Regions:
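Extracytosolic ligand-binding ectodomains
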Residues: 2, 7, 29-399
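Bacterial N-terminal signal peptides that target proteins for export
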Residues: 4-17
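Cleavable N-terminal signal peptides
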Residues: 16-18, 28-29
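N-terminal signal peptide c-region/cleavage motif recognized by signal peptidases
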Residues: 23-27
Length: 399
C-alpha cells in the first residue's frame, strides 16, 4: 500500500509548482527579442583656451555604449535577446533634431544623447506623448534637475550639485571648513561656482573670499609668478575650490597657491562618476574589457553611456520585452536596480529622473575617497545627500 505523508505531499507540491514555473518561463522566452539603441551626438563648438591635453577622445561615450551592448549580448544570448547600436554625429542643431524624427519613424525608441542643455530641452518637447526613452549622458547642469525638469529624459551623468556635495562632504569630514573660491569668467564656470556655494551653505563650510580669473596670461610660462599673487588673501584658507569647466587655468593652481593648500573642483581632487583608478567591486574587469576594446582608458562620459545602455538591457532581461512603454514604467519604478561596479545598486530619482550613485573623489593617479562620506544620514538612502533631494528640487515629475 502506497502512503503519502504530509511531508512527501509538500515535497511533490513544491516540485510540481517549480516544474510549472519552469515551463512557463521556457514558453515566455521562446520568442527572440531584438532591441535597437541609437547613440546620437551633437558636436559642440570648441571652447577657446582649452588645452589639447584635456580634450576627450572624439569617441568618448560611444565606446562606453558599445561595451555595454557587448556585455548585454553576453547575457542576452541565453535569454534569446539581442541588442544593437547605431551611431550618428550631427554638426548642426536642425540636423540633430531631424535625425530623431527619422529614427522614430523607423521604429527606434531608445536614444543615448550627448548634447547640451538647449537641445535636450527641445528633444523633451519633441518626445511629449511618445513612448521613447532619452538618456542624457553629458549635460551636468543643475537646472535640469531642479527648475527645468524634463519628463522624458533620464540622466546618467551626475549633476554639478552632486559633485559639489561630494566634495563638500569630504571637506566637512576632514574639517577643512575655510574655502577660497576661484571661478572662471565663462557662464558655465559661474554656474559651477554657484553650485559649490549651495553645497558650502548646505554643509556649513565658509567661503572666505571669491575671486574671478579673467586673465589671458600664458600660465605655462608665468604660473609661478602670477598665481601666488592672485591667491593671496587677508584671511587664511584650508583649501582652494576652482570652478573652471574647460580647465583653462585650474590645472595651474596646485602647488602654486600663495598658501600651500590643496586644490579641489576642476583640478586637484575631483568628484567623478568614473575614473581609471577605480578598481573595487569588479571595476578592474570592466576597465580591462574597455581597454581591450577601445585601446584607451574609460572616462566618465564612457561610463555614463555604459550605464544608460545597461539600464535598458537590465530591464529587458527582467521583463523579456522590447516594448518601450513597459521599459519606461519599469525603469521609473521603485523595483528598478542597476548593478554598476559601485558597491551598491543604483536607481533613478523619481522626481528628477537623475540616477543616484556614489561618486569617486580622485586625483589623476589615485582614488582618495568616495562620497557619501561616513556619517551622512538620510531617511531613505544616503545617496540622496548628493544633489537635489525631493524636498529641495522644484521638479514634480513623480508628484
Amino acid at each position: 500500500m502506497f502512503v503519502v505523508t504530509r511531508a512527501k505531499f509538500k515535497k511533490y507540491l513544491v516540485k510540481s509548482i517549480g516544474f510549472c514555473l519552469w515551463l512557463f518561463s521556457v514558453n515566455a522566452l521562446s520568442s527572440p527579442i531584438t532591441l535597437d539603441i541609437s547613440y546620437v551626438k551633437l558636436v559642440k563648438a570648441p571652447v577657446a583656451g582649452t588645452s589639447n591635453f584635456f580634450k576627450k577622445p572624439d569617441d568618448s561615450g560611444f565606446q562606453g555604449a558599445k561595451l555595454a551592448v557587448s556585455d548585454s549580448n553576453t547575457t542576452g544570448k541565453f535569454l534569446q535577446q539581442h541588442f544593437s547600436l547605431s551611431y550618428f554625429v550631427a554638426t548642426k542643431t536642425p540636423q540633430f533634431l531631424d535625425h530623431f524624427e527619422g529614427q522614430y519613424q523607423q521604429g527606434r525608441r531608445i536614444f543615448i544623447i550627448d548634447a547640451p542643455l538647449a537641445q535636450l530641452v527641445q528633444l523633451d518637447r519633441w518626445a511629449k506623448n511618445k513612448s521613447v526613452l532619452l538618456f542624457n549622458i553629458s549635460e551636468t547642469a543643475d537646472e535640469l534637475r531642479d527648475s527645468q525638469c524634463l519628463s522624458s529624459v533620464l540622466h546618467t551623468i551626475p549633476s554639478d550639485a552632486m559633485k559639489s556635495d561630494a566634495l563638500a562632504q569630504w571637506l566637512l569630514y576632514r574639517r577643512m571648513n575655510k574655502v577660497l573660491l576661484i571661478q572662471g569668467s565663462k557662464d558655465e564656470d559661474v554656474l559651477l561656482a554657484n553650485s559649490f556655494k549651495r553645497s558650502a551653505k548646505r554643509f556649513g563650510l565658509k567661503i572666505i573670499d571669491e575671486k574671478q580669473w579673467d586673465f589671458n596670461t600664458d600660465l605655462r610660462r608665468s604660473a609661478q609668478q602670477e598665481i601666488p599673487l592672485f591667491t593671496q588673501t587677508v584671511k587664511d584658507y584650508d583649501v582652494v575650490y576652482a570652478a573652471d569647466k574647460s580647465k583653462s587655468f585650474a590645472e595651474f593652481l596646485p602647488f602654486n597657491t600663495y598658501l600651500p593648500r590643496p586644490v579641489i573642483g576642476s583640478a586637484g581632487l575631483e568628484a567623478l562618476a568614473w575614473h581609471s583608478v577605480i578598481e573595487q567591486w569588479g571595476a578592474t574587469q570592466l576597465q580591462n574589457r574597455f581597454i581591450d576594446m577601445a585601446d584607451r582608458k574609460m572616462n566618465e562620459l564612457d561610463f555614463s553611456a555604459y550605464l544608460a545602455v545597461r539600464s535598458v538591457a537590465e530591464s529587458v532581461h527582467k521583463l523579456h520585452t522590447n516594448k518601450s512603454n513597459e521599459l519606461i514604467a519599469y525603469i521609473n519604478s521603485v523595483d528598478f536596480e542597476l548593478a554598476a561596479y559601485k558597491g551598491r545598486k543604483l536607481s533613478f530619482r523619481p522626481w528628477s529622473r537623475q540616477l543616484r550613485m556614489p561618486l569617486a573623489l580622485v586625483h589623476p593617479h589615485a582614488l582618495v575617497s568616495q562620497s557619501p562620506q561616513p556619517g551622512m544620514l538620510h531617511p531613505i538612502t544616503e545617496l540622496d545627500t548628493l544633489g537635489f533631494d525631493a524636498q529641495e528640487s522644484q521638479c514634480e515629475l513623480s508628484r
